[in-house]
Amino acid sequence: MKVSAVRGLLAAAVAIAVGVAFVMVPRAPKVNKPERRTAERVFVMGFDGMDPTLTSKFMAEGKLPNLQKLANAGTYRTLGTTQPSESPVAWASFATGVNPGKHNIYDFLVRDLDTYMPDLAMVDKKSHPLKLLWGTIPIAKPVPLSTRGGTSFWVTAGLDGVRSKVLTVPVTFPPEEVEHGELLGGLPLPDLRGTVGTFYYWSTDLSSFEEGSPEFGGYLKRLLFDGGVSKTYLRGPESPILKQEEAALRAKQKSSALSEKEQARLTELKDIKDVNVPITINWTENSGKVDLEVQGTRLSLKQGEWSGWVPLTFNVNFLIKLHGMTQFFVQRADSELQIYAHPANMDPRDPPIAISKPDRFAQDLVKKIGVYRTIGWAESMDKSLQELRTDEASFLYDADKAFDDREKIIFENLKDDNWDLFVAAIETTDRVSHMFFRLIDPKHPMYDKDLASKYGDAIEKVYRRADALVGKIQEKLPKNTTFMVMSDHGFHTFRRGVNLNTWLVQHGYMVFDGQESPKKGLDDLVGRGQFWEGVDWTRTRAYAVGLGQIYFNLKGRESRGIVSPGAEYDALQKEIGDALAKELDPDDKAQIFRAVYKRDDIYKGEYLSNAPDLQVGFNDGYRVGWQDTMGGVQRTFVENNNRKWSGDHCATATEISGGVFFSSRKVANASPHIMDLAPTILELLGVPLQKDYDGKPLR
């Protein structure tokens, strides 16, 4: 076997080790167009979640002078967004210029039509089993699968000879080849565990019951010291080899009883299949500092201090090694020791799978600016703040550092003059808004007057930093550049969680085993430990998964479908939609939903069959409840959101959830839509437009 082939197969194993299948992103057919310089250049700066109401307020107060200047000289509008107003959906429409029915991204989550179980969208993790030689060496690649349809406008531009740079734009992982261009992947680029961000937390004051994975993701580990020394570890990816062995034993278990030896091995695999990095901690109580050793790297950190990026090597076996990196933060080192670590980012110096195109683009960037965060959601402390393991101050410090990383990447690439199209995105505006909306909304259940006095300006500060970046970019742009600033959606307070599955149970659309009527107490139906446990699919007509999506248990689509296509489907759509639209908040009789949309009214295209049958549109203040997003059933239909994640936009009615659009050019269109940007940019660059765009060029 050739060396290049072996390397390719090892890469396949690595991809499975981090939980990502090789994915073929749709591409337009190649044509032989040489590189060319366009008469016009276009620079697009995206700020995830920048809200038009807050932007207008801050501009009126004189706090965003650069955006105000851009608005005065050119155009400022609210930018219409997608159904639903979620980042992956909207950014996919931004890239392709089409509605979700043509690009196939409808939510952060998708459901398995056989098992009904939810999984992350955007990257399809399914693949054929990894074939191994001698149980060690991979000898066959997983099958490439596609998740997103449509063609990114930068791909179309590249095929016409346009030179481009695309930097950390959401829904650009796996990275796609761009002719005459360079692309650095963004969301959903995972950590080395294959998740969007598993944080680590070690503490002496954790109980044994708290150890493990909490509700919002992460890994908590109790520290026990002997003579001032504690031996622990940083949890890594699952070994693809041991994972396959476990899968084989489980498959055998379904058809026949396992031997005593096989059962013992299956039990053992649960504890040993993760590939971990050992950590030694030396600490004296009340010393105010701690010493760590991580694979030869020695750290001495004081309370409140961050480490630099620490390299990590996960040894899957003698052939497969995964290279990552993390940062440690000592939250306490007094009477208790509390240590946080970032998710294990792929090391851009030697990423286990491609995170950029060309592949070396990511590595070459390190030589110019040093190491940088690679995970798609660069602001990694939202989950630990949700779990009350870290505080607001450390979150904001880290968010600022994440912004630094993205900004350095932008300006390093601006040093080159070899581009006609430049597209970059920063998501810090979104992450800060999610976590701090409670401190600008006195009616929020988690509003805290003292915290508001300290951090009530957190959202304003990140908007002002975005404005400063806009000004610095403008100073460096060539004169013939159209400059656009945009966001994918706006923001709202999230005071109340709405449990759609609870409503479906209460009204008889979802039924559990042994449930005689929908009015039977829900106490018996919750807390069973697994999603859909006990659901009677022979009597269930509808179920909710994700952030506002309702699916019917449809014959010929779901594995145990009972709803017939045609008249029965149409009647059920109207029945549930009309009933939900009338629902009022039991606390204050406020209207919960602004609208409930039927599938065929909002989507069209070749992926229509994958769309939800109903999509809800919430009024301000409401969002799907936390457990409901993954198919859980709670005791009450509406409940307070008692979480620090207090601002949101997911499934808020599109009519009130638009983003922002600024342009250095005058635009006559009073109601631009995010789907309009792809054809607008291509027209400015002189690239022929495809026929299937849903958006129209803005003029």
Indicate residue ranges for each PLM-predicted region:
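Low-complexity, glycine/alanine/valine/leucine- and proline-rich hydrophobic stretches
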Residues: 622-669
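N-terminal Sec-pathway targeting helices
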Residues: 1-14
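Generic recognition of well-ordered alpha-helical segments
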Residues: 66, 93, 575, 579, ...
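Juxtamembrane extramembrane loops of integral membrane proteins
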Residues: 40-42, 49-54
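Second-shell loop/turn segments in exported
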Residues: 53-57, 80, 141-143, 667-668
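A long, amphipathic alpha-helix that forms part
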Residues: 23, 35-37, 55, 396-417, ...
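Hydrophobic alpha-helical membrane-insertion segments, chiefly the h-region
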Residues: 14-25
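Secreted, luminal/periplasmic, and some membrane-associated catalytic domains
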Residues: 36-40, 47, 62, 72, ...
